[in-house]
């Protein structure tokens, strides 16, 4: 190899590694798919190795391609940090931050928080990905994300955002039509609203397993927003954290003292964490979660 690879070729390499197909990578880069293919061919020829296995399903990194990826991502992070510094990021955060969050948490907690952040940072923009799953940070779907399962491999900054509890809730009309609930064993006679079990975004969402019996799931939804509406319409009991339940009386807590406890983790790729705009969102989420324990648990924070 007589010359070093061009950074732009490595950028095309990263986008194809993340997207998996030429067309998806081309959309991210705002170029034709033939341009992506040509850049990858040039990079492979320059390095004298095959970086991707090609198939009808798309492009998958070879072993050597996977070995190159963290080096290319480190270069990407350095380029982003350099651009921020040159543009005066030491004075004010600017640019776009893509934040991946669970859907209800994103709508009810994070969106109002981002509105206040943007008022104080006129050069900052937020892409809020409020999803019924967790953002794929490995493919750079988001710059940082809130999730139940922190990554165990790769270069990430990870911190516990908050411990939270799922409590039992039901509509008053449902409770009026069904046998009373005074102890946990009474729950076996009731209907439940839950996630679609073969579409769980995380095994941590199988909290109904902690009931001690197999619940009678009358309606299952892929996201919590659908569950909240179904439970409010009297279709069964559901479990949810305090921040998810509207204070409009449509749902009331059942069986005080029973809950399932989980933790949210805040995660960002290590190279993106260095960016001022990403750290600004990171620090805001950390500070807000610490200051609002009632969003996550009823009563004292410890058992």
Report the location of each language-model feature.
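C-terminal regulatory
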Residues: 139, 151-264, 290-303
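The DNA-contacting recognition helix of HTH DNA-binding domains
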Residues: 33-34, 107
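Conserved amphipathic alpha-helical core elements
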Residues: 43-44, 251
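Residues within the DNA-recognition helix of helix-turn-helix
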Residues: 32, 39-42, 113
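A short LG(V/I)-centered, amphipathic sequence patch enriched
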Residues: 44-61
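Alpha-helical linker/hinge and terminal dimerization helices associated
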Residues: 10, 46-47, 64, 68-90, ...
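Short helix-boundary/capping micro-motifs
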Residues: 15-30
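Central regulatory/effector-binding core of bacterial HTH transcription factors
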Residues: 94-154, 303
